[in-house]
Design a protein with these regions (language model features):
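N-terminal active-site segment of His-dependent metallophosphoesterases
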Residues: 1-54
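His/acidic metal-ligating clusters that form di-metal
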Residues: 27-36, 115-148
Length: 148
């Protein structure tokens, strides 16, 4: 069975981000040698370019592959564009392994804390989950906001 680590809400910024705590967390995560790390948004606090640059340096400290979806803080100040440039695709995405599938949804909107998954994205997710049942794969749906 694969070992997957979930992290969220790092809020990398000049103020309020505790680098020492993060570095300790990275060491503990790397020590357990996970197969994947899933990051479910709010990597940055304000979506500023310099926050994303700083965040990519921190994320580079992980030994395992990273699967990331954006949060509402990442979408601020055109951060969704920087997310795609430096982290990866913001929109719906999928990664498959022999044992599991991670389905990533984008529930973020700038300055809207409640989040939203629209109908087209929901239908796409349903299709992916149906395929997971057919293929008998363990499935994980990753998004920043709560489902209910």
């Amino acid at each position: 069975m694969p070992l997957i680590v979930h992290i969220s809400d790092l809020h990398v910024s000049e103020l309020g981000f505790d680098e020492d705590v993060f570095i300790k967390a990275v060491a503990e995560i790397n020590a357990i040698n996970p197969d994947m790390i899933i990051l479910t948004g709010d990597l940055t606090n304000n979506g500023y370019y310099n926050e994303f640059v700083q965040a990519t340096k921190y994320l580079g400290m992980f030994d395992a592959p990273l699967f990331a979806v954006p949060g509402n803080h990442d979408a601020r100040n055109l951060g969704y564009e920087t997310f795609e440039e430096l982290i990866g695709e913001c929109s719906w995405k999928l990664t498959k392994d022999d044992e599991f599938v991670v389905i990533g949804l984008d529930s973020s909107s700038p300055d809207i804390s409640s989040g939203n998954v629209g109908r087209p994205q929901h239908l796409w997710m349903e299709h992916q989950l149906d395929q997971c049942v057919i293929d008998e794969l363990f499935s994980i749906v990753a998004l920043h906001h709560h489902v209910i």
